UniProtKB/Swiss-Prot annotation:
Entry protein name: Large ribosomal subunit protein uL2
GO cellular component, one term: large ribosomal subunit
Keyword Transmembrane among record annotations: no
Keywords: Ribonucleoprotein, Ribosomal protein, RNA-binding, rRNA-binding
Transmembrane annotation, as ranges: none
Amino acid sequence: MAIRTFRPYTPGTRTRVVTDFNEVTGRKPERSLVVAKHRRKGRNNRGVITCRHRGGGHKRLYRIVDFRRNKHGIPAKVAAIHYDPHRNAHLALLFYTDGEKRYILAPNGIAIGQQLISGPESPIETGNALPLSAIPLGSSVHNVELYAGRGGQMARTAGSSAQVMAKEGDYVALKLPSTEVRLVRHECYATLGEVGNSEVRNTSLGKAGRRRWLGRRPQVRGSVMNPCDHPHGGGEGRAPIGRSGPVTPWGKPALGLKTRKRNKPSNRFVLRKRRRTSKRSRGGRDS
């Protein structure tokens, strides 16, 4: 999939970069795999805002995606590639030989009419789902299960993949997209290949209105608020923060604070921690 740039006819097209969607073949989603989804708009059950800067956006229908790939031994044909408004990755519509239809994450390089299958005896081909014990070392996988039978939970975003590093006993070592190396049970399933639509990381919205279409509301800097609204607020003119470092609206450290519990039981499965991103790459926005 290629990216498309625009001439600066308007301020919104000057920096606009989008994907050309030439992989998407189906215009309308499969009716049997679509459900209505209530949009919470960042509110909890009491109507209180628990996640700021959420609301509005285009109305969506949720596509039911098969993350388990539990139809073992039943071949399926790729009928179409569909757009999904809830994620950057595209969806592949599968027609199984027993008549059932399912959506899966579309792997990179998949083609219309290609035959896919899941199970421990499946061939080593892109799009097939196998247990980690049956996948060769060095292979790239996505939609990796963390617990057997629960469905894929890791490496699901567009262009992402995990790498099978080693096998020892009942566990397989995976290098995740975050560079973390983690042990996963060998009976957990994963799909061969990487998730498609990897060019989405090179896109640019170009204007604030396109962000509103996605359901993202404006984000106001804390330094321009009053001191009753944010710890960064107050002062005369453009005053500094007045603290040793930036904090959240609730007074907690905003950058560099570790949020993982020290004594979490699953820490023993993490062989190497992820590489910490710098403040420059994270973007130290005054929230």
